[in-house]
Every structure is written in C-alpha cells, then in structure tokens.
Amino acid sequence: MAIGKRLKKVREGIDRTKLYPIAEAIKMVKERAVSKFDETIEIAFNLGVDPRHADQMVRGVVSLPNGTGRTLRVGVFARGAKADEARAAGADVVGAEDLVEKVQGGTIEFDRCIATPDMMPLVGRLGKVLGPRGMMPNPKIGTVTMDVAGAVAGAKGGNVEFRVEKAGIVQAGIGKASFSEEKLVENIKALTDAVSKAKPAGAKGTYIQRVAVSSTMGPGVKVEPGTILG
C-alpha cells in the first residue's frame, strides 16, 4: 500500500478537532499501530512555560508502573568498588578515563548515563557531546549518585527522564503497542503526575495546555487533559 493511502486509512475515524478521554484515545492509537514492529506509544504535553527562562525549566524522572517495554543500554562513570557495583547491577558499559576517551572519540555505547559525584569533573568534559543528546548526568534526576546500583536498576526497570524542549513541549515514550490499554493508561497517569509535580515556580496560567498521544508511525490523537490529571 502506498504511504499516502496508508496514512489516509489510519487517520480515518479521528476527529482532529475533538479532545478524547484518555482510554478512548489509547484505544484509537493502538488500533492504528499496524506496522510490522512493536510500535512505541508516545505522549506529548504542551506546557505553559518558556524554557528560555531558568525559572521555567521542567525536568524530572519517573518510574513507570508497567515499564517502557524498551531495553536501555546503561553507561556508568565510576571507579573501584562503585564500578564493580555498577557491573553487578547490570550496567552495559562501565569506566572512567577510558570511557571518557571513547565518548570523546565518538563511540557512545549507551542510552542512559550515570556517574558518581567524584567523576563529574571528568564527565564535565563531555558536555558538548552528551548534553545535546539529553544524556548528561544530573543530580536532580538521580543520575549523579553514589547509589549506582539503584540508578542502574531504575534505568533498566522503566525509569523515564523527561525534559521540556524549546517550544514548551515534553515528549516521552510510555510503552509499546503490545501493552494493554490499562497498562498504557496507568503509565500515562504516572508520567502526568510527575510532570505536574515538576511545575516550575515561574509558570503562569494553565500549566498543561494540550496533550496528544500517538504511536511511532501513527497519527496523533488529542486528549482531554482532565482525564489524566489527578
């Protein structure tokens, strides 16, 4: 089937002007996730913030109750006993100066990055490489920590990091099309709660303004915010 015809078919039945209750929206998205692979179900929040101002940044991490369905590769910058702890917890890549050199050379073999506090002067050199990818370790989201085992377990077990983009949008994957509707809704409500709690002091007016859900290859479905809040 031609791409244009496929898109037209999957968009059928979606009212672009309507806000759907979350359960109905997820059902519609799942029905239209017809690719041969297990598509990721994603959510996007349009927030009433201007991230150009330091007091309007939104960032955090949340453990989704049903995981993400995705296997993350976790890299840890640590030495000695903490490096051993990271390996025992299942970290995919562990190192210190050697790992910094690999990353500086363009080899990034992880999706999530964790560091012990003493490693940050070294890891700081990687800001231009890891920063744009959203991978820079940060104590505010628990990726600069002495509890490397806990951080690795969290990353492997379904922790989702979120961060507002320039246009005031937070996007995140909250599961797979193979998940039940109930599990996806539970994950969405957990993420929404975390985003709500991360509301910055500088935010004015309505905080969560618009919400939409979609699958990797499918169309977006607008959500009634009241059905995912609280």
From Swiss-Prot:
Reported function = Binds directly to 23S rRNA. The L1 stalk is quite mobile in the ribosome, and is involved in E site tRNA release. Protein L1 is also a translational repressor protein, it controls the translation of the L11 operon by binding to its mRNA.
Q: Which SUPFAM superfamilies match?
A: Ribosomal protein L1
Q: Name one GO molecular function term.
A: structural constituent of ribosome
Q: Which GO terms describe its biological process?
A: regulation of translation; translation
| Entry GO CC | cytosolic large ribosomal subunit
Arranged from A to Z, the UniProt key words for this protein are: Repressor, Ribonucleoprotein, Ribosomal protein, RNA-binding, rRNA-binding, Translation regulation, tRNA-binding
* Annotated protein name in UniProt: Large ribosomal subunit protein uL1
Q: Does the keyword Membrane apply?
A: no
- Tell me its family: Belongs to the universal ribosomal protein uL1 family.
Instruction: Kindly give the PANTHER family that the UniProt entry links to this protein.
Output: 54S RIBOSOMAL PROTEIN L1, MITOCHONDRIAL, LARGE RIBOSOMAL SUBUNIT PROTEIN UL1M
Pfam families found in the cross-reference section: Ribosomal_L1 (PF00687)
Repressor recorded as keyword: yes
The record, for PROSITE patterns, names: RIBOSOMAL_L1
Subunit structure, per the record?
Part of the 50S ribosomal subunit.
